[in-house]
Amino acid sequence: MKLDGYTRLAAVVANPIKHSISPFIHNRAFEATATNGAYVAWEIEASDLAETVANIRRYQMFGINLSMPYKEQVIPYLDKLSDEARLIGAVNTVVNENGNLIGYNTDGKGFFKCLPSFTISGKKMTLLGAGGAAKSILAQAILDGVSQISVFVRSVSMEKTRPYLDKLQEQTGFKVDLCALEYVSELQARIAESDLLVNATSVGMDGQSSPVPENIVLPETLLVADIIYQPFETPFLKWARSQGNPAVNGLGMLLYQAAEAFQLWTGKEMPTEEIWQSLTEKYQ
């Protein structure tokens, strides 16, 4: 990697963040595209967020990525938000356009780009969970022309989830159906008519649990996706593959959301195939 007086910085800002694989992805991309850039991880306290954002301008950085807990907290310090960031109410990428700081959310785009030979336009989706990742997938699906979305959460989370879906409907005119995960017959009915089933919960990270009962029958053509990438194959994906369904883990989402950010910063396409090879070797 070339480092000199012209090197521009990008960083991921969160707490904790030292475990992040974003520096691995972006520094590979800078090198592969002959871009004079360097990408680092900044673990900061909330009291340092305003100063950190000011440093994007001060040091003429490409921009920053954000992870928890700063995706929402960063918004007041930005000049403008993209459509999807406004809908989601969270930013994972800040782009420095000649001193104007623009907030984007590339998670949803990254998710749909990682799905093999699949477009969401005109399709039906069942989504498990309603956290940050789920919101970005939801908003992007609506922007991309999805025809129906069924969101399943635990019954104790229904009340907390509804206001966001109501706000989404106000902003887009699109009504998302909210259902309780405990109603297995409803879950089966919605999955039976879906083209895409997504686990956007953390259930399965332990390598043992699954977000849905194993007696659910999947339609043959259903594509199944999990946002988890460690373990590389969750029990949920293993179960889907055992029924003969195509299944995708969350590593592709991580790579393609990074590729979207990289393009916004540099105007260049990230060599995703080359980096995917390195990532799978690292995490499989």
From Swiss-Prot:
Pfam families per the UniProt record, alphabetical: SDH_C, Shikimate_dh_N
Highest taxon of the lineage: Bacteria
GO molecular function ontology, one term from the record: shikimate 3-dehydrogenase (NADP+) activity
Keyword terms: Amino-acid biosynthesis, Aromatic amino acid biosynthesis, NADP, Oxidoreductase
Pathway: Metabolic intermediate biosynthesis; chorismate biosynthesis; chorismate from D-erythrose 4-phosphate and phosphoenolpyruvate: step 4/7
Residues that hold NADP(+) according to the record: D83, G129, A130, G131, G132, A133, I227, G250
Catalytic activity line of the entry: shikimate + NADP(+) = 3-dehydroshikimate + NADPH + H(+)
Binding residues for shikimate: S20, I21, S22, S67, N92, D107, Y229
EC number(s) on file: 1.1.1.25
Gene3D superfamilies cross-referenced by the UniProt entry: Leucine Dehydrogenase, chain A, domain 1, NAD(P)-binding Rossmann-like Domain
GO annotation terms (biological process): amino acid biosynthetic process; aromatic amino acid family biosynthetic process; chorismate biosynthetic process; shikimate metabolic process
InterPro entries xref list: Aminoacid_DH-like_N_sf, NAD(P)-bd_dom_sf, SDH_C, Shikimate_DH, Shikimate_DH-bd_N, Shikimate_DH_fam
UniProt-annotated catalytic positions: K71
NCBIfam families the record matches: aroE, PRK00258.2-4
Subunit structure: Homodimer.
PANTHER family noted in UniProt: BIFUNCTIONAL 3-DEHYDROQUINATE DEHYDRATASE_SHIKIMATE DEHYDROGENASE, CHLOROPLASTIC (PTHR21089:SF1), SHIKIMATE DEHYDROGENASE (PTHR21089)
Stated family: Belongs to the shikimate dehydrogenase family.
Function: Involved in the biosynthesis of the chorismate, which leads to the biosynthesis of aromatic amino acids. Catalyzes the reversible NADPH linked reduction of 3-dehydroshikimate (DHSA) to yield shikimate (SA).
Name this protein carries in UniProt: Shikimate dehydrogenase (NADP(+))
Species assigned in the record: Streptococcus pneumoniae serotype 19F (strain G54)
